[in-house]
Amino acid sequence: NLILFVPVLSVSVYRTMDKIMLGWLSTYSSVGYYENIDKIINICLGFITALGQVMLPKSANLVARGKIEESNRLIVKSFKFSTLFCSALVFGLISISDVFVPVFFGTEFLPSIGILMLLAPNLFLLAWGNVLKTQFLMPRGKDMAYIISTLLGAVINTVVNVMLIPIFSGIGAAIGTICAEFISLIYILWVIKSDFDIMKFFASVRYIASGFIMMLGVVIVKQYVTVSLAGLFALIVTGAVIYAVECVILAYFKDDLLLEIMTIARKTIKHKLLRH
């Protein structure tokens, strides 16, 4: 079945295409700048795709048993969890990019900073697309919509790359990737809107707002740290503390997802303590 090859294709096609076209239309140094950031994004992407792989069997089972409403609730919960997780990653990467890149890659790779700041938000699009593909399209047999969304993204990416890479190099490739994932996501939302209340996804905006506030806090603290490993560590800790406090505040105001996460965490900790 062709659909079995699409998940593999959709994970790698855009950035693989980006690097190939960068080599054709720009310089080899621009490929290097892009390649380093691609590695970072791939690490983050691994956690995102893992969620889809874990939830696919459960979603398929619910649909097969006719429990559509329960399946829809699971999709909303997964969408919210992905947004909660990605908000920390996206705004964290953006806020520390100008420290992270010189510390890990060296000052000669400073052009990678702009690429990282552009590609980081793409994690939102990848995560949301992954949830909808693996928990809605695949379990409900909408294979063709899945394939079209991937091919549509590939076409958009190619067109934008041809237009922008000769002018903006790696930045142009990053813009092409974002455009591709955005159009692909919009197409999927259009496909599912008749069977699913997509307005429920807007409850996730609170996590994006929390991530943005965290980023502002890190940017303020960044004025007082050096471009060093210690400075980078201080920024990461600052961001983690701010985001954790925000999550506690949201839970206090009865955020259902965070209340569930905290309940599971308490039970897990209590169980482990009792075992010892």
Report residues per predicted region.
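Helix-loop junctions and terminal segments of transmembrane helices
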Residues: 37-79, 83-86, 133-139
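Short runs within selected transmembrane alpha-helices of multi-pass transporters and secretion channels
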Residues: 7, 11, 15, 38, ...
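Helix-terminus/linker motif at the lipid-water interface of multi-pass membrane proteins
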Residues: 5, 9-44, 61-62, 98-108, ...
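Membrane-proximal transmembrane or re-entrant/amphipathic helices at the cytosolic face
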Residues: 219-276
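Interhelical loop/hinge segments that connect adjacent transmembrane helices in multipass membrane
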Residues: 1-15, 54, 58-73, 194-208, ...
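Residues that define the loop-to-transmembrane-helix transition and helix capping
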Residues: 29-32, 76, 110-113, 143-144, ...
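Hydrophobic alpha-helical transmembrane segments in multi-pass integral membrane proteins
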Residues: 11, 158-161, 213-227
